[in-house]
Amino acid sequence: MARIAGVNIPTNKRVVIALTYIHGIGNTKAKEICGTVGIPAERRVNELTDAEVIQIREAIDRDYLVEGDLRREVSMNIKRLMDLGCYRGLRHRKGLPVRGQRTHTNARTRKGPAKAIAGKKK
């Protein structure tokens, strides 16, 4: 099992699919990485040489923000919005949808389970 960016990559999958197990790398970025390193997309992880794994690791470290650094960046951006007190920050603080969705009905994922209202029993 190859270890890239602190993640164990599955050995029997194709390289493009295996790279998507890293947080911050999707299908498009995985294909870009394979293109820059010069690895065919059909090659499987267990067929890679140690030098190719090192090349992939260096390309990811050099060009992309992944795993813990990416998570930290996103949380710092949200914290910055909350500290500014802008509308989006207030929505994050209250735990409501941020991007303009309706909240009269729905939005249960963001708001949490429904709270019982007294006087609604039959």
UniProtKB/Swiss-Prot annotation:
One of its GO terms (cellular component) is small ribosomal subunit. Residues 99-122 are annotated as: Disordered. Gene3D superfamilies: 1.10.8.50, 30s ribosomal protein s13, domain 2. Keywords: Ribonucleoprotein, Ribosomal protein, RNA-binding, rRNA-binding, tRNA-binding. One of its GO terms (molecular function) is rRNA binding. The keyword Iron-sulfur does not apply. One of its GO terms (biological process) is translation. Coiled coil: none annotated. InterPro entries: Rbsml_uS13_C (IPR027437), Ribosomal_uS13 (IPR001892), Ribosomal_uS13-like_H2TH (IPR010979), Ribosomal_uS13_bac-type (IPR019980), Ribosomal_uS13_CS (IPR018269). PANTHER family: 30S RIBOSOMAL PROTEIN S13/40S RIBOSOMAL PROTEIN S18 (PTHR10871), SMALL RIBOSOMAL SUBUNIT PROTEIN US13M (PTHR10871:SF1). Located at the top of the head of the 30S subunit, it contacts several helices of the 16S rRNA. In the 70S ribosome it contacts the 23S rRNA (bridge B1a) and protein L5 of the 50S subunit (bridge B1b), connecting the 2 subunits; these bridges are implicated in subunit movement. Contacts the tRNAs in the A and P-sites. Belongs to the universal ribosomal protein uS13 family. Part of the 30S ribosomal subunit. Forms a loose heterodimer with protein S19. Forms two bridges to the 50S subunit in the 70S ribosome. HAMAP family: Ribosomal_uS13 (MF_01315). This is Small ribosomal subunit protein uS13. It comes from Parvibaculum lavamentivorans (strain DS-1 / DSM 13023 / NCIMB 13966). The lineage of its organism: Bacteria, Pseudomonadati, Pseudomonadota, Alphaproteobacteria, Hyphomicrobiales. The gene is rpsM.
